[in-house]
Amino acid sequence: MASSEAPPALASGPVAWIRENLFSSIPNTVLTLLALYVIYVIVPPLVQFAFVDAVWSGTDRTACATEQQGGVQPNGWFGACWAYVGVYGEQFIYGRYPDEELWRVDIVGLLFFGALIPLLIPSAPFKRENIIFISVVFPVVALVLLTGGHFELNGFMPTGFLFEPGMVKFWVDYLILSAIVVGIAYAIARASDKDPMPGMRGAAIFMVGIAIIMAIFAVDFGLEHVPTDRWGGLLVTMVIAVTGIAVSLPIGIVLALGRRSHMPIVRFFSVVFIEFWRGVPLITVLFMSSVMLPLFLPEGVTFDKLLRALVGVAMFASAYMAEVVRGGLQAIPKGQFEGAMALGLNYNQMMRMIVMPQALKLVIPGIVNTFIGLFKDTTLVLIIGLFDFLGQIQSSFTDPTWATPVQALSAYLFAAFVYFVFCFGMSRYSIFMERRLDTGHR
């Protein structure tokens, strides 16, 4: 008679998962115990500070100060001062934007997220309409609402000896610029032995579109003008991050293609652009754009400080994005290019329909990682006097009304939570898209 044996170990369920993933070997067991110890050391005090001992209401520093500090809390109390965050919450989001005009910022936010969310949902309809709205219509509407519109259009070319600064000079200069752009399109087409008409037509349509947008900016909509130096908080962070993300991806794609181009001039300028911006710290870029650039401009020509920061951040991010996209292009097998050419596709069709979709699919993690880094790098604009979300929080520390030992800790914890929500959201969506597009190779 066979001897009885113990039943086999549980092969499914939480106990089996814990045994397999956390205590499967001696090194895993040591790492698990070490992680549990770190969690025990960090999480309970954090929960105690942020929730259990936190102060949720109050009108001044006395609500978040101990009796020895002139407050109402017992000596030895140590908790978050969410009352202070609640009082300054509006300033953390809008900066010094006029209170009576905050509805304009709210509308811009609703329009942006209202168009972005359906665009991110794969099954949502009207994708093309959403893309057109968020890439063409929304920037115009947002700029008019946030600034008030009614921009003064002056000339930007050395034609002052013919016209006085004003609307007429601007449109004359714009016609000259349009002719130059169309001429460049013609020269590029001729150098590539292609029909110049499609390129010239596209350049002309593009310049006409820009002219329509500029005409809209010049219209007086009756809105109060709000200069960008009154913007701040999360508004500035979102403006810089969204602009940088929206601009860096298409420019990065063009630069990546240019660096792989067989035309020496295109490849040379693409390499120079990428290596220059990659070799300079972002702080230096912001400092140069804000302090040094105005010194090289003609007298009377100025650019808004926020605009200079937007250009610097966008160019900086574009260089890194170009290398991410180039990595995806290099990962595409040569057979994909040969198959596309065998089908009779030209270069543009091959890149648009065959190569680029596969390349972008492969580098989704790198693209989103660049976006996350760009979002966090917006905090550097404080060095040039722009008060982004973190800068606006730091500026509130000078208010003696809420000066307590826990003021800065509460504010930085709130800032960390906000940044985590945005960055974690981008990370999770990246994982979702990877799984949906099946970027793995079996």
Question: What is each PLM-predicted segment?
Answer:
Residues 2-442:
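Transmembrane alpha-helices and adjacent helix-loop boundaries
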